[in-house]
Amino acid sequence: MDEKLRLHEFMEIYYGLILFEIKLDKELRKQRISSSFATTFFVENKNLESLRGEIDAIDSQIVVLLNQRVQAAVEIGRIKSELGVDPYDPAREEQVFNKLEDLNKGPLHKESMRTIYREVISASIALEKNLVIGYLGPEATYTHQAAVNNFGSTLKYRPLPDIPDVFEAVECGECDYGVVPIENSTEGAVNRSLDLLVETELTIIAQVFLEVEHSLFSFCKVDEIDEVHSKDQALAQCGEWLRRNLPKARLVPITSTAEAVKNLEPGSTFGAIAGKMAGRIYDVPTQADAIQDRKNNVTRFLVVARNALPQRDGVRYRTSLVLSLSDKIGALKNALKSFSERGINLCKIESRPSRLKAWDYYFFIDFIGHRDEEGIGEVLKELEQTCTLVKFLGSYPEEPS
């Protein structure tokens, strides 16, 4: 009996030891995992702090170098001012952007590099001179966005009510430069801008391409909107989306996409179509993005100034002319022959009534090259002999800003 009791006690103790070992093993495993996690976290946190310290050190160098660059740019601006040279030079900027693209080995994309340096150059110009950029307003139009894309956010911008006002403000010196739309990939030419290029003495010094993405803004949900306001072109460019999503809504054309958003009020059942910039500036909720029917909707804008700029090496140029042809058979063919014989690439021909007499037209021609390049001067001389009007509108970088 005693032996059986001792055996039973032994078995209980032995079983308890086994359970204790199992429990101990689990606890040790848990401790090892915790220890491993703590070690990994400590190492990774140490690496993170080290990398942050490296970034801080790099930032310190960047700030010093940026200020050195700006100081050099300001000195250039002072010399330009003494020489009577314009502070803004899009061709020189294109040289800078091209050089940066060659230097950039990644991972930063070239578009990002261009955007960063666009702002660096803008800040430098702002310290050189208080430039004023006029544009077709109101604030937050696509023209405003194109102007900021071209000049950067640091300069002063002045919204103007109509395209003629932009030309007039630049002509009289109230604005240093003007930005106006010239054509859209779906709607065609902006005729008022074409007319004013002929009627005024301003010259084209740059072009800007802006991909137009329409958004729907409203203080109410899409299914509650009963009226949509926007510029007539924007309403047309979103026609299919509107018919599909707001078939009963009344479409109201007004003078500006930005104005449509600006006029929206909380509690109303109105919507407005405009670019994202308008929603940000006027603080109106976005109900739908990218509602345009065609995704390749691009508007081209021109930057106009009082003075033309000199040609620079390493920059691909586009030149714009306006011609008026004599009333003879084959007049247009003969004019275009001057370009083809010298291998000059025409990239645009646009006709527009001259408004001088019935059935008389101006021909707006764009071609690749600068007015001062070899061969192009000869073309211009030939055109002057065969055309009743040859007006140079500007040579400017072909690469869009």
Where are these regions (language model features)?
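Aromatic (phenylalanine/tyrosine) cluster motif
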Residues: F10, Y14-Y15, F20, F37, ...
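Compositionally biased, intrinsically disordered low-complexity regions enriched in proline and serine
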Residues: E9, Y15-G16, R32, R118, ...
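A short, highly charged, low-complexity intrinsically disordered segment
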Residues: L7, R29, P400-S401
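Polybasic, lysine-rich low-complexity intrinsically disordered segments
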Residues: K4, K30-I33
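N-terminal amphipathic/hydrophobic targeting modules at extreme N-termini
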Residues: D2, R6-E12, G16-L17, D25
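Short, often N-terminal, low-complexity regions
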Residues: L24, S34-F37
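Coiled-coil-like amphipathic alpha-helices with heptad-repeat character
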Residues: M1, E21-E27, V64
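Domain-level signature for soluble enzymes in the chorismate/prephenate branch of the shikimate pathway
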Residues: F37-S401
